[in-house]
Amino acid sequence: MKTKLATMAVAAVMAAGPVMADLVFPSLSYRTGPYAAGGIPFADGYADYFTMLNERDGGIGGIMTKVPECETGYNTEKGVECYESTKGQGALVYQPLSTGITYQLIPKATADGIPIHSMGYGRTSAANGDVFSNVFNYPANYWNGASGAINYLMSQGDIAGKKIALVYHNSAYGKEPIRTLEELAKKHGFELTMLPVDHPGQEQKSQWLQIRREKPDNVIMYGWGVMNQVAVQEAANIRYPMEDFIGIWWSGSENDVLPAGDAADGYKALTFHGVGNDFPVFADIQKYVVDAGNAAGAGDQIGTVLYNRGLYAAMLAAEAAKTAQEIHGTADITAAMMRDGMEALEITEAKMAALGLPGFGPEFNVSCANHGGPGLVGMTQWDASAKTWSLINEFAPSDMDVIQPLIDEDSAAYAAENNIASSCK
C-alpha cells in the first residue's frame, strides 16, 4: 500500500509540476584504446536501455533520462577528469567500468554525495556499506568470482593436492582475487601459482611456457581486453584443455574467444547475469532503439556478453531510480536520493520478468550493511561451432565464510586510515 501511495504521489507531482530536468546517468566510456573492444558494447548496452525507457515509457517516473558519455580510454587520470567535468550536470550515479578509476573516485564521489556502482569490479570491500556509504558493487564482486571458480571445480571433483594457476592482469584489478584464492588454497588444500601479465597483455609466451612445463590442473584468468584473446590463443598453442580454463566475467566475452576459432571450444567463464538475446526486452530494444535509428552503436552487439552487461547495469540503475522516486515521493530525484534508492533496491524474479528479463540475474536485496548483494555466481561455456555462450551452472553461492572476514578486515583498515564513522544506524 505504501508503494502504491508513493507511486501515486510521484504521478500527482508530475501531473501538476513544471517541466523537470533530465535524470542524468553519465557514462564513463572507452570507445578508444587497447580496451575499446570491451568498452564499446558495454557503453552501447547502457545507453540503449535508457533510450528504450525514453522512447517507450517517457523516461523514468515521467522524467526523461540522459546519458552523457565521456571518453576515458580506460585511463585513470582521464576517468577522474571525466567525473569532474560531468558531475555538475546533475549526475545521479557513476559506473566507472575500471577498477583504477573506481579507486580514485571513491573518496571524491563520497565527498560529493554521488553514488558509484562498480558492478562486478572495483574495490571489493566496498560491499561493506557501513564504511563505503556511497559505493555499491552488487550483485557480485571479484572475490565472489574467485570463490565461484573454486566452488565450481569442487563440484567436479576433489581439488585437494591439485595445482591451480592464476593468470592475471598486473594491475589493481588483476590482483584483487589473490588474497581470496590464497585463503581458499589453505582451506581446500590446493597449490596456487600466480602468473602476472603486464598491460596490455599482448606478450604472454613466458607465462604459457611455464604452464606447459608445470601442467596445472586448472587455470583461472583475470584478464581484460586483448590480454584475454592472446591467453586463449596461447592456451590453444600449447594444447591446454579449454574445459580446464576458467575466466572471470571480464574474460568471458565473444571478443575473447572468436579470434581462436574452433580452438577456443569448451572455454569457460564466470558470470553474474544472463547470456544471449532470448529475452523479451530485446524486442523492445530492436523496436524503439535500433529500428528507430536511436542505437548508440551499430546495433550489431545486442545479446553479446558485454552489451548485456551494460544493459543490466542500466536496468539496475533505472530500478534504483524508481525506488528512490517511491521513497522520496518525487520523480525529480537528487544524487542523495538515488543513493537511498540503491540501498533499498530489491530485485525479484517477478520484477525481472516484468522488465522482459526473466531469469537474467540472481534475485537480491541491498541494505545499509550490505552494498554487495548475495555474491551468487554462474558459469558459462563457449560453443565455438554455434558461436554462443551457454549458462552451464546456475547462479550459486560463494564462500562468504572466507570472503566476509576479508571484506571486514579491508574495510576496517580503510575506515581507520580515513577516519570514517559508521554510517548504518
Language-model regions: role of each:
Residues V24, A37-A47, R56-G129, Y138, ...:
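Beta-alpha junction/loop-to-helix N-cap segments that form part of ligand/metal-binding clefts
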Residues A16-P18:
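N-terminal signal peptide c-region/cleavage motif recognized by signal peptidases
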Residues K78, T124-S125, S133-R239, G276-A283:
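Extracellular/periplasmic Venus flytrap/periplasmic-binding protein
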Residues A296-Y307, A318-N393, S398:
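Segments of small-molecule ligand-sensing domains
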Residues T72, I116-S118, R123-A127, P200, ...:
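Venus flytrap/periplasmic-binding-protein-like
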Residues D22-F42, L97, K163-H169:
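Short beta-strand segments enriched in small/hydrophobic residues
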Residues A235-A314, D410, A421:
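Extracellular/periplasmic periplasmic-binding protein-like sensory domains
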Residues T86-T99, P115-M119, K163-Y168, M194, ...:
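Periplasmic-binding protein-like
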